């Protein structure tokens, strides 16, 4: 059996670059997997309750289930020696709670926090639709106001995705949680 892998969580507001950075980071590591938290949401074809500014109890329960599944999946891959890169929007008190869900002893958290103007520009350039009920600016406000200041907060506004990955790898010790 291989040595246990690390779990690296990448979060930030919509349009912060999480998917691109997580993909590039995963490709840089020799034995790794990219876990898209959003995938678990999309698996629900009937009965899905999406998050809104005033979420229903079902939406909150489904969000917690999504976070549970992402953490369990990351831990399972980690047990088999994979570095598991978990990428999702995790805001407010949910961030500290999510980190506690991960059992892997080597846990890291990177919060991509580009400027609001960079987020808005990136959102305009995107082909994919993010959260229909929430803007990147609204998510960024919650991130900055309510997220626990844990992990490595990275203003990647002036970085290319490749530079952001280099920054993360060079500062991974600062991301330990």
Regions found by a protein language model. Give the residues of each.
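P-loop (Walker A) phosphate-binding loop of NTP-binding proteins
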Residues: 13
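Walker A/P-loop
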Residues: 19
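Glycine-rich phosphate-binding loop used to anchor ATP phosphates in small-molecule kinases
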Residues: 61-104
